[in-house]
Regions:
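N-terminal periplasmic "start-of-domain" segments of outer-membrane beta-barrel proteins
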Residues: 33-64, 91, 120-131, 180
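Non-catalytic regulatory/gating segments with a bias toward low-complexity or hydrophobic composition
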Residues: 53, 61, 73, 149, ...
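Extracytoplasmic beta-strand/coil segments of soluble accessory domains associated
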Residues: 74-119
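Short acidic/polar hinge/loop motifs at secondary-structure boundaries
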Residues: 114-153, 307, 313
Length: 316
């Protein structure tokens, strides 16, 4: 009896230990993010990737407190910098984003894993690394249309080509098949300028039994900002009686943005053979009014003269 009782007690202790270990493992179970960028093989988890990859969910992006996707990414991705570009020609309208200190066209931009075309703007007069670069326009992608953003912060030109020297940013569009959301944001700077209002939304619909159609939109208005001081030469013209000179004559700040409208659509359906048919696209437009360098008529004698006659001599 003593031996049997001892064996029974030992068996119970062993079984109890096994159950507690199993319960502990189940409580700490988690699912890793799987990414496909930065590897030639099959998709792998972030922790097993041989290169630095950041995965940002739509919730992570929305926590930054701004409605500008460029600024949202700058606040979430290490080594990604985006600058306001006052008086930088068209770069004031399509702001370049720099990953790892390299030019905007050194970062490959993809949407759903497909290469995004470059913008029509060549950055000019902004100075620094972006002069002459022609990157993709990230600002046309509304944050509400995204499921997640994958950022490869390492050179990948051997895999993707020379436009991935700085890395790769892959925007994965949301693929909901029902429901949606609507949001409205507004704000301004403490100086009292730069008032911004944004309304955005998305809605998902089923496509057959195994498909989806997700549509999203964003409408944004932004007033300009100015941190300018009057130029001395413009102030001298005003003092001389020229009332046509603006104050300030040259504006340094963010441009005014009107009717910034963006629409995105993402759809997909599973075929009977296991393959997937998909389609996505976008439409966007906006009007931008920004400042430029001041042309002093008093110092442009080669332009405002006809022979020895000064064409602007009597301008008030």
């Amino acid at each position: 009896m003593w031996t049997a009782s001892k064996l029974s007690i030992a068996t119970l202790i062993a079984v109890g230990s096994m159950l507690s270990v199993g319960s502990f493992a189940q409580d700490n179970e988690y699912v890793e993010e799987v990414v496909s960028i930065g590897t030639r093989g099959k998709p792998r988890s972030v922790s097993s990737s041989p290169v630095p990859v950041d995965v940002l969910s739509s919730e992570d992006i929305s926590k930054t407190g701004t409605d500008d996707l460029l600024l949202q990414l700058q606040g979430s991705v290490p080594s990604l910098n985006v600058h306001l570009q006052p008086i930088s020609d068209a770069a004031s309208m399509i702001r370049p984003a720099n990953l790892r200190g390299l030019s905007a066209d050194s970062t490959l931009i993809t949407v759903n894993g497909k290469r995004r075309h470059h913008a029509s703007v060549i950055a000019f007069q902004g100075g620094g690394v972006n002069d002459g670069s022609q990157g993709a326009d990230i600002s046309v992608i509304p944050a509400i249309a995204l499921k997640r953003v994958e950022v490869l912060r390492d050179g990948a030109s051997a895999q993707y080509g020379s436009d991935a020297i700085a890395g790769v940013i892959n925007f994965v569009l949301d693929d909901i098949s029902e429901g949606g959301s609507l949001s409205y944001k507004m704000g301004e700077y403490t100086e009292g300028d730069g008032a911004t209002s944004t309304i955005s939304g998305k809605y998902g619909m089923p496509l057959g039994q195994d498909g989806f159609v997700t549509t999203s939109f964003q409408i944004r208005q932004a007033d300009d900002t100015s941190r300018s001081a009057q130029r001395p030469d413009a102030a001298a013209l005003i003092a001389a009686g020229n009332s046509a000179v603006a104050n300030p004559a040259q504006i340094w700040g963010a441009p005014k943005i009107d009717d910034d409208v963006t629409f995105f659509m993402n759809s997909g359906v599973m075929n009977s053979d296991g393959s997937e048919s998909y389609m996505f696209g976008n439409y966007s437009e906006r009007d931008v009014d920004g400042g430029f360098y001041y042309r002093n008529p008093d110092g442009r004698s080669g332009v405002f003269t006809i022979g020895d006659y000064r064409a602007v001599g009597n301008v008030d």
